[in-house]
C-alpha cells in the first residue's frame, strides 16, 4: 500500500508539472519576446570628434532612429574613448565614470528614459562628441490590415484552438499514464 501511495504522489506531481509546462507552451505562443536591435553610433563614420561645422552630428544621427529597451548601441572608435554620463555630465562635459578606450564598446539600453554618452576627453565633448538618446519602453505592434470578419474569427479560433490542443494533449497523456499504472495495482 505504501508503494501505491508513493506512485499516486508521483503521478500528482507529474500532472502538476504537465499543467505548468502546458501553460508555458500556451503563453510562449501568445506572448512573443522582443529581441533588440543593435546600432553603431555614427554609422560608418563611427565615434569621432565632429568637424567644426557639424557639432550636432550625433543628434542628427540619433534623430533618425527610435530606440527601445533591449536595443543596444555600439561605439566604434580609434584613439578615443566613450563614457556613459548623467544629464549634468552630458551638458557640462563632465565625465566621472570609468571610460572605455579599447576601440569598441557596446551598451545595452535596459531602461526607458534618456541615456547620455560623451567622450571622456572634455575638449572632444565640447566639440560635439556626445550623444543623448530617448529610450522607449517597447515598440507598439505594427498595424496590420484588418481581415474580413469571417477571416478574423477563423484566425482567432485557430490560434486559441492550437494552444488549447497542446495543453489538452499533455493532460490526456498524463491521465492515460496514471490509468495504466493504477490499473496494474
Curated annotation (Swiss-Prot):
Residues 1-21 form the signal peptide. A lipid is attached at residue 156 (GPI-anchor amidated serine). Expressed ubiquitously. Accumulates mainly in anthers, stigmas and ovaries. Residues 37-137 form the Phytocyanin domain. Keywords: Cell membrane, Disulfide bond, Glycoprotein, GPI-anchor, Lipoprotein, Membrane, Signal. It is a lipid-anchor; GPI-anchor. Residues 136-155 are annotated as: Disordered. It is found in: Cell membrane. Residues 157-185 form a propeptide. The keyword Zinc-finger does not apply. The keyword DNA-binding does not apply. Pfam families: Cu_bind_like. Gene3D superfamilies: Cupredoxins - blue copper proteins. Glycans are attached at residues 79, 94. May act as a carbohydrate transporter. Required for male fertility and seed yield. This is Early nodulin-like protein 17. It comes from Oryza sativa subsp. japonica.
Amino acid at each position: 500500500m505504501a508503494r501505491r501511495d508513493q506512485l499516486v504522489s508521483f503521478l500528482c506531481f507529474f500532472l502538476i508539472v504537465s499543467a505548468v509546462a502546458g501553460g508555458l507552451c500556451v503563453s510562449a505562443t501568445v506572448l512573443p519576446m522582443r529581441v533588440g536591435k543593435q546600432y553603431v553610433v555614427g554609422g560608418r563614420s563611427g565615434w569621432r570628434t565632429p568637424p567644426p561645422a557639424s557639432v550636432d552630428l550625433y543628434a542628427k544621427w540619433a534623430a533618425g532612429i527610435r530606440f527601445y529597451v533591449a536595443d543596444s548601441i555600439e561605439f566604434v572608435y580609434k584613439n578615443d574613448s566613450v563614457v556613459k554620463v548623467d544629464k549634468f555630465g552630458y551638458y557640462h562635459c563632465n565625465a566621472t565614470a570609468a571610460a572605455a578606450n579599447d576601440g569598441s564598446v557596446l551598451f545595452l539600453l535596459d531602461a526607458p528614459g534618456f541615456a547620455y554618452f560623451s567622450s571622456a576627453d572634455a575638449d572632444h565633448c565640447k566639440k560635439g562628441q556626445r550623444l543623448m538618446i530617448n529610450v522607449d519602453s517597447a515598440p507598439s505592434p505594427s498595424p496590420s490590415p484588418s481581415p474580413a470578419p469571417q477571416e478574423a474569427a477563423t484566425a482567432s479560433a485557430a490560434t486559441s484552438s492550437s494552444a488549447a490542443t497542446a495543453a489538452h494533449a499533455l493532460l490526456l497523456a498524463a491521465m492515460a499514464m496514471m490509468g495504466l499504472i493504477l490499473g496494474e495495482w
